[in-house]
Amino acid sequence: MNTTTLIELTAPQAVNGRRAAYQSLWLLVRLYHAARYEAATEVVRLAELRQQFTDARSLRMFISRAFRDFSRWGIQVGWGEDADSDPRFLNPDRRSQGPFWLPPAEADKIACVVDGAAATREDLLRFLNIRSKPVPAEAAGMPMPADFWMRYALAQQNLRQGQLLATMAEHAGADRNPGALAGFKDAARMAVSRSQHALAALGEAQVWRRLDDLEAARKTLSRLRRLLKEAGPDEGGYLDAMEQILTAWCAYSQRDVALTEALLAAMRDIEPRASVVRYHPRIRFEWHNLMALVRRAHALNDRNSPVRQQAASESMAHFASALDAAFEIGSFDAAQQVAANVGMATWLFASEGLVPGTDAMGARPEALRWLLLSEWLSQRSGTSGQSAWNAIYLMRIARGHCDAGERPSLPAFRAQQPLQPADMAGYLDASADFRIGMPPVSDWLSLADRLLSAQQQGDSRYSLLQRCGCRLEHAWYATHAGELGPASRSLATLAAEIAGLPPSDKAFFQGMLRRFPAEVS
């Protein structure tokens, strides 16, 4: 154990034999109690300080004075939502916003005594008057503040529209939109209950995952788990299930299919999560959509498996259940995700010979109809408009029958004949109402240019895998059109970006790079 900081709890309170300010000492003992006996919580929030010190003229001044005392006593206290951070590197400008926590190594330095004898937990509780903790939100009085819900709703809308980070106005350099990440963090600072803190943490974790920052996503999910443990059996199950779903998504994003499947299987088989998966339509959508992707991975990657066709069939069954749940909750955004996945899976399974009596060309009409349905839903879902995945999938399927081999000559490459956007009209005889889903472009290169321009101008933000997909399609259609300069630049960018992909995804793109003529490679 490190050098001990001795705290005498009886009046006059003292630290290492010297008189100590009561408020500063109270906060340190409260943090010590949280670290020692409240492992599921660990943090002390501003709401508790306001409840305990109602006559404090300025909470900011109180906190500043307390941290000066902590420094004088040789104790480092942390602040912010990430209790795993090193307090030495935290930004002091955000300190007054809390919450506060005591690292385990710092807690080991402290010894609390009562009249010189070691203090028990009951002694600590009596000193802290812990019964004066804030009333739970469920029993809070009126008026109920709207601040949290206003910030949270805006952050949710930004998340749905793909506005993950702050965007700048075209003039005057002012923020046009704080973005979903900042919005959920702001909402967390305004939260007045465990459930609100948990909702904000869930939203933040979703943003980090979509930003491809899986480490930050996992840290935020760890914070969410602590909040859920504190809530105990009162939590209805949705947040706990979503924490598991996001944890599984983080594993899938790194193509750890075995871990993803294990997490999902545990949710399905073990109560109380099994009941949430069964009866909560949003969780049922998330679970089946991700499990469908897992089974799709088995069907496409386990080439020596005798049950590939069964895995493909199971994947489609899970997609069907996910689509049922998406429409049950009335979410066009959820439904368009499933429709896009079904369209691509339909074509991929047929391409691999996993659909009896159907090859890639035979499956193409139905695959395209699913993708156009997805785009129609996307344009009506209140999100940011055209789906990048739908565009990438359409362009890939349109050239799917083209195969000039590795390192083809430029004339041979350009002689290939991909399906053109205008050719899709023949697939829509029974779906005239869904023509809006067709991209309003005359050729695929224009669509690829539009996607890249939206990314470069900050109008859309794509994941790393989406960026690589866009670059590949742009390079293919630019080469086909004879625009070798833009094609070469896209291939160079693609070659650099694939370094951040999981090995299986990287291998796919490396194989595709070898299928371009030397003039652009």
Task: Name what the model sees in each region.
Residues 1-182:
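Intrinsically disordered, low-complexity protein-interaction/activation regions
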Residues 1-9, 16, 20-22, 56, ...:
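C-terminal non-catalytic interaction modules
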Residues 129-139, 166-185, 209-228, 254-274, ...:
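Helix-turn-helix repeat elements of alpha-solenoid scaffolds
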Residues 144-148, 184-197, 226-238, 269-284, ...:
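Flexible helix-coil transition and linker loops at the boundaries of alpha-helical arrays
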Residues 150, 157, 176, 192-193, ...:
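Short coil/turn linker motifs that delimit alpha-helical repeat modules in TPR/alpha-solenoid proteins
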Residues 155-173, 199-213, 239-256, 283-304, ...:
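Tandem amphipathic alpha-helical repeat scaffolds
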Residues 319-323, 327-458, 467:
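Eukaryotic tandem repeat interaction scaffolds
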